[in-house]
Amino acid sequence: MALLQISEPGMSAAPHRHRLAAGIDLGTTNSLVATVRSGSAACLPDAEGRVTLPSVVRYLENGGIEVGKTALSAQKTDPLNTVSSAKRLIGRTLADLHQNTHYLPYRFGDNQRVIELHTRQGVKTPVEVSAEILKTLKSRAEETLGGDLVGVVITVPAYFDDAQRQATKDAARLAGLNVLRLLNEPTAAAIAYGLDNASEGTFVVYDLGGGTFDVSVLQLTKGLFEVKATGGNSALGGDDFDHRLFCRLLEQNGLSQLNEQDSQLLLSLVRAAKEQLTTQTEARIQATLSDGMAIDTSISRAEFHNLTQHLVMKTLEPVTQALKDAGVGKNEVKGVIMVGGSTRMLHVQQAVATFFGQTPLNNLNPDEVVALGAAIQANVLAGNKTDGEWLLLDVTPLSLGLETYGGLAEKIIPRNSTIPTARAQDFTTFKDGQTAMTIHVVQGERELVADCRSLAKFTLRGIPPMAAGAARIRVTFQIDADGLLSVSAQEQSTGVQAQIEVKPSYGLDDDTITQMLKDSMSNAAEDMAARARAEAVVEAESLTDAVNAALELDSDLLDAEELQQIRQGIADLQGRLKDGKAEDIRAAAAKLGSITDNFAAKRMNRNIQRALTGQSVDNI
């Protein structure tokens, strides 16, 4: 029998044939697909020469589906069946949207776990809507390239959580795409700029898209792309600038509630006005509503800037934090890469230039740069030969860990750890005879579980009954290249194991995303004090349990005075547990330990005597 051949890792099975792969920027407002041909990355146009595909899907009465510009043109007249900005909804719940549903012209379902949109073709989810966009891009790529795609790299905001990332992969699967990797959008931009310009040094990627904001601090050196720190807000983007203009328009015209058609009409007009103000000093908004009311309003560039300046400043908060996390000063940044169509707004460019004291880089189209980087990555992962070797190191934005006794958060994978990664740590039981252990996986920077985000729980059963602290349970955290987490727990003596893939049914809400890191910094001293107290409580409870168990077995070794002293020591310690500080609890525990020293010695002697009873000198 002939031996099977195995190719070298990374090599194509057919080394002389270019394998077709593509990079997809699945955007809030527009989506693009790009590929590498003749060693150069380029976005693929549609039949009319347009590279951008509006991220809009319309469900028709005849059962058909429109995607892109045709659907966009019907948004004003058929808003309930025309879905845009699905990226803002994917992997989220109604609760995550807070009060902002009133300006979204959709009929939402009552499902609390998954957002549902009622259309004439029935209930549709953001995953299904996104899948239609991906199908269109897949068809465009395969028709242009003349063959089937072996795989794609799809970009996502760096601050997308597990639910949003998994939902994106589900959409790709529905579209019939093989996902080679999910790639953070700022990282994709760095790939495009790094390879095109052969730059080295520290760069900041400022990515303001239609629905999300991301910032990454990257170190680019020859052959190495390393993400030093990330930050951002998954619910801040160009749509929010539109929303501010929309609300101002309602205020100026004394409007409160609009029907879906009028809402969609005005939203499209304020979006057009926003884009006009990039090149003009004034924009005019004219419309006739369904009730016959006429609207004719002008807004100046200065008014628009004043109205939305707080949103621009809001983007600089994660920028400041990311620089701090990376240990980099503004003066050390070699360049600022602008990504996303929303960075075309002049006051955004001005704010970034003022903050860094330099003109941002914009020699690549900000709408295309993410797709270009994804295409380069897809080309490498497909096994196609490249002119030069390079390595991409991505990071996880928040720490991951688990709950230990006393409500403490034990970090297993610290934030800004390079991914993919796997880390393990041994834990033990707290109670004698404990045969099960609940593994509570959390995310965040705070010291107490109550202040972190709960991701998942699972139970390891079948632990052999042993004395407290004797069992050894190894817990392993593993994050794949897409940023998805799996956790396993294994009891070392028996090999009994349990595991879980963390796929939460909801996303982080807006406040949580932006506040988690700031809270960890501002509450650092209080958190450490709370952790110290919690640790002292755990140690004290363990001590009192051990002493009480010993008294049940061997209290006859003590006279009345000794027994009273120990019971008083236990009472004093338990009294400190209610409201005492960490140092007070530890002092009371030390006192109880001292009181029980003689008791421990007597117990040791008794156990030795029992062990020696009936033994000959020779046996000993």
Curated annotation (Swiss-Prot):
BP term (GO), one = protein refolding
* PROSITE patterns linked to this entry: HSP70_1, HSP70_2
Q: SUPFAM superfamilies this protein is in?
A: Actin-like ATPase domain, Heat shock protein 70kD (HSP70), C-terminal subdomain, Heat shock protein 70kD (HSP70), peptide-binding domain
Signal peptide position in this chain?
Answer: none
One Pfam family this sequence matches? HSP70
Q: Which UniProt keywords apply?
A: ATP-binding, Chaperone, Nucleotide-binding
**Cross-referenced InterPro entries, in alphabetical order?**
ATPase_NBD (IPR043129), Heat_shock_70_CS (IPR018181), HscA_NBD (IPR042039), HSP70_C_sf (IPR029048), HSP70_peptide-bd_sf (IPR029047), Hsp_70_fam (IPR013126), ISC_FeS_clus_asmbl_HscA (IPR010236)
Q: Give the Gene Ontology MF terms in alphabetical order.
A: ATP binding; ATP hydrolysis activity; ATP-dependent protein folding chaperone; heat shock protein binding; protein folding chaperone; unfolded protein binding
Which Gene Ontology cellular component annotation is one that this UniProt entry carries?
cytosol
- What does this protein do, in the record's words? Chaperone involved in the maturation of iron-sulfur cluster-containing proteins. Has a low intrinsic ATPase activity which is markedly stimulated by HscB.
What family is reported? Answer: Belongs to the heat shock protein 70 family.
Under NCBIfam families, the record lists: HscA, PRK05183.1
Q: What is this protein called?
A: Chaperone protein HscA homolog
Give the originating organism: Neisseria meningitidis serogroup B (strain ATCC BAA-335 / MC58)
Give the gene that encodes this protein.
hscA
